[in-house]
Amino acid sequence: MTNYKTDFEALRKQLSAKPVDPEKLITPDPTPNTQRLWEYLKSCYGKKFISGQQYLWEDEKEDLVYWNTTGKIPAIRGYDFMGISGLARGYDQLGRALDWARRTGGILTMCWHWNAPDDMEDIAKECSFYYKTTNYDHKTGFDIVRVMQEGTPEHDFVIYEIDLVASALKMFEQADIPVLWRPLHEAAGNWFWWGNRAEAGKQDPESVEAYKKLWYTIFDRFMNLHKLRNLIWVWNGQAPFMAVDPNTFDIAGEDIYDEIPNHGSQLERFRGVSSYTHGKMITLSECGSIPEPDEMLRDGATWLWWLPWWGSFVYDTDDKWHAVLDDNGMPRPNPKYMDEAFMKRIFSDPRVVTLEDLPWYDKQKKPLPYALHQRLRKKYGKETGI
């Protein structure tokens, strides 16, 4: 671990003195592929909607649902750094993310469900990204305020992990793969250890300030120490009181899960995040339900992409969260969030960008994701030509 330290006062002064330009990446010298992706995102904004999907399990059943229903798969693929440190074994997704981007040329977005120990004296005992005040089975008392106090074991832990993630992202840069990078998501909520510790709708100034310092620490180390050039930064703070300097992110994200699923435009939420993010493009960085393109365009709630969560948000499951299979042994759409007719209509809409619609996608090679390729070959045989 390097002795590099972030000078917060100097960094904030430097950032605030710089004009905000939503048209330009905050990375001063991005890789050519990163710049190309940025220009493409800008060309879509307000006119088209890029389809996305978050993944967890290695079999990636979500693809089977999309492919068998529509003959297409989403253009953006969401993966997670949650398993990078070894505290949450079995959740390492980096190899899959790298393989998918290399094979298909699809767009990657990466979040970080950051597992942290409950007991710094016995870090293997219990870890979680959920804070101790939640009702989840696994949770942590890892303290965001102590995290930002130099000399504490919590501080040393996060600096080590930040640099570990930077090394992984450098691997993507060396492979010429840009990443839509979304750390410290949903920070206004009190369910993650890095977030606001107050009750819903309120704010705890101490934890809010610590969160902002943690954001600036990640930004500073990635940008100025590790000099990563392949990132498009997505800020997902979810409230104006959590806002960080606009010169530290390129796109603003909002995560929306309604108690009753609906396909409305989410105009109120779109307007809300637009009001405090300085003209940055706005995206639906996580969702339970995909909005209707007609409604988004009618209302002017032109989310750049959408990203349904994994598992039962896409395919039907039983009471033990196992996929319910159809007569062909394949997972089927979950009608609670999107039935077969809705999925077909959305993925055939010319305003919706799927993987094959990306301008650099090679339609001759048809490089399906590996897990989907293997499952289809096993089920239908070589005669399909897949």
Model-derived features: positions:
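Aromatic-lined carbohydrate-recognition surfaces of secreted/lumenal glycan-active proteins
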Residues: 52-54, 182-184, 215-241, 279-290
